[in-house]
Each structure stands twice: as C-alpha cells, then as structure tokens.
Amino acid sequence: AAAYRAQNKNVDPYVLFAWQRMCELLTKNIEIADEVDTEKLREMIPDIKQVMFMRANQIQKKLTAIFSECGIAFRIVPNFTGAPVQGFIKKTEDGALILCMTLRQKFADIFWFTLFHEIAHVLNGDTKHEFIDFDSVSGEVESKADSMAGEFLIDSKEYKRFVAAEGYKRSSEIERFASTQNVKDYIVQGRLMKEKIIPWKARPRYEWA
C-alpha cells in the first residue's frame, strides 16, 4: 500500500500507475550496491549537499552515483498531469530501493528541500514497501520529514540567530550565512521567503525533466 501526500481529487489512478511504472523502468538498469545502507546514506549527507554547487547538467549523474553506493536507484523523472508527485520510493522484490523525483515546480531550493525530505523518509523507515510523496496533505510523518530535511540543510539554532540578528536584510550576509551551512544562498533565501521574512522574488530553476 502506498502512503499518500496529496488531495486524492487531483490524482488520476491510471496516470499515477503509468508514472510509477515509468519510474521502475527508468531505474531498472542502474547499478547499485547489493543492499540499502541507511547509515552510509546518513554519512553521505555532506557529500549530497556539495552537489548543489555543481553545474546543473552534472547534478543528476553525481546524485545517481552517490545513491547507488547506498543501494538506492535514483532518477529525476518527468511529471504527468494527474500525478502531482514530488517523490516516489519503492522497495523492490530483491530488496533494492528506488527513489524518483520530479521537477514539478523546478525551483532549485524546492528541489533540494524535497530531495532531503525524501532522504528523511528513507532514514525514518517510512518506506516499508512503497511511498508516494505528493504535493500536499500533512501529518506527523510528513512533519517529521520536513523538520529533518530543514535541519540537514540549515542548522535550526544557527538559523534562528541569523534571523534574530536581521542578517537577512543584506544579501552579503545571506551569502555569508549560506557558506557557513555549506549550501547555496538560494537555500537560505527560499526558507526566508517561505517563512515570509523576506518578499518572494526570482530564484534559480532547473530544467532537466
């Protein structure tokens, strides 16, 4: 059974089934470690964060290589109308794990937050068989994954100090703080915008899928 993160009225079950099948086919030939290693995945968090500093056309290849070492077949896939999916995680019959993501909104900061959100689901054991991560619908499982993803990207205590000092009022300070967290400045900007601390403005997008 799949765990849902969406309003089901937006989901076409036939489209969703086709999309899931596409994920399975696109990850079928990816060479991965014999078994899922969640401890190694946790250890690789700093390496995964470093990937955001690479050129956009190199990111998917590098992420695929990192996840492969952890026994996870990773792929960024196109999204379909009728399947408002952010991520799909499935344990295969041979014990491997598939992790697919879409670029529905294409914003770079949302991509990285969603990626770490999916990683949190893996580390939290939310993927016993199959987990479909849609765009909406909340709950304890989702809140926990959101919190963990946010912490992976930006230390919450240091972020609170940064906000309290009003460093967000200067772009140079945003860049400086981002460097202390080993993330791109758009990660900090995205969080500040989401929390309505700064106004919404243009930010980088990806165009892979």
Residue ranges and their predicted role:
Residues 1-209:
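Active-site hotspot residues in diverse enzymes, especially metal/ion-binding acidic/histidine motifs
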